[in-house]
Amino acid sequence: DDKIDITNMDIYEDNSVDVFLCSHVLEHVDDDRKAMSELYRILKPGGWGITMVPVLIYSEHIIENLPITSEAERWRFYGQGDHVRFYNRQGFVDRLACAGFKVNLLGVEYFGADTFERNGIHKRSVLYVVEKI
């Protein structure tokens, strides 16, 4: 396992990764656009990845860049001391697409309830499956 900065994955060459899993990481990253660009850069054409973030279903936009900097303030606002944003569904999809990805939203109806349950994924969760075409 490699421990690296997701916004600067220079240990990986361009187009060198077949598949990635990025689960509940991007909401912690100050520059999530750079992280998404790095994921796109290292992914091989035809490769794919699964991304998951907490999403506010009823929000009309991503909530970020607030003057909330202390861990205590983040706990009060985000419910976790190291989150830096709340995503909404369309905003998250748009950011992934801006990085170059084709984005597919796949849920329990695609994978099946048994698969979700076996992997500890909530039945209302959506997996953002991205592809580099």
Residue ranges and their predicted role:
Residues 7-20:
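A short acidic, Gly/Pro-enriched loop at the edge of an enzyme's catalytic core
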Residues 30-40, 44, 48-133:
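S-adenosyl-L-methionine-dependent methyltransferase catalytic module, highlighting the catalytic core
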Residues 1-9, 57:
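Class I SAM-dependent methyltransferase SAM/SAH-binding core
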Residues 3, 25-26, 86:
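Alpha-helical architecture
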Residues 18-30:
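A short SAM/SAH-binding and catalytic strip from SAM-dependent methyltransferases
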